């Protein structure tokens, strides 16, 4: 890959991760369920429930690890967006991009893709995408994004 010398992937709890150099990009799909019934599978519950990684702890670590020009991107349920953005703001990070994802055109967005940076002010870029058309087919956007992953 042309990125082999430039990309590092770490599979570890962010609470235990330390790196003095900092990162230009941090991507997360953090646990987000709060005060809800937990799955009996403890690994699955830890991956989904925010008590294993509260938003405050995530942003504390992101703020420490992100370079001054870096971008933090996250996938968040739409109902958690306000709290997530507020927590980012407490740690000096502002939303620069938001993309709301609808499963179909008739349904409300279920997920939001958020990008944060340290740069203050400016207007947030906001878009919306649909995964599946009303006829059940993948949307043009989703097909273009994922077509290389399908077996032909």
Which residue ranges define each predicted feature?
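Mobile active-site "lid"/loop adjacent to the S-adenosyl-L-methionine
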Residues: 21, 30-57, 61
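S-adenosyl-L-methionine
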Residues: 1-24
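A conserved beta-strand element that flanks and buttresses the S-adenosyl-L-methionine
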Residues: 27
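Conserved Class I SAM-dependent methyltransferase catalytic core
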Residues: 52-109, 113-114
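Alpha-helical structural signal in soluble globular domains
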Residues: 1, 87-91, 119
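Short, catalytically relevant binding-site loops at active-site mouths
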Residues: 16-17, 32-34, 79-82
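SAM/dcSAM-binding transferase cores
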Residues: 106-152
């Amino acid at each position: 890959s042309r990125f082999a010398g430039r990309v590092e992937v770490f599979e570890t709890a962010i609470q235990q991760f330390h790196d003095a150099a900092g990162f230009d990009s941090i991507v997360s799909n953090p646990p987000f369920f709060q005060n809800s019934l937990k799955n009996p599978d403890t690994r699955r519950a830890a991956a989904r429930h925010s008590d294993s990684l509260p938003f405050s702890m995530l942003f504390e670590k992101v703020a420490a690890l992100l370079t001054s020009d870096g971008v933090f991107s996250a996938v968040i349920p739409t109902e958690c967006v306000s709290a997530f953005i507020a927590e980012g703001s407490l740690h000096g990070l502002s939303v620069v991009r938001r993309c709301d994802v609808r499963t179909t055109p008739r349904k409300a967005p279920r997920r939001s893709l958020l990008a944060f940076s340290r740069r203050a002010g400016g207007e947030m870029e906001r878009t919306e995408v649909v995964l599946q058309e009303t006829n059940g087919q993948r949307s043009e956007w989703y097909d273009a994004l994922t077509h290389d992953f399908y077996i032909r």
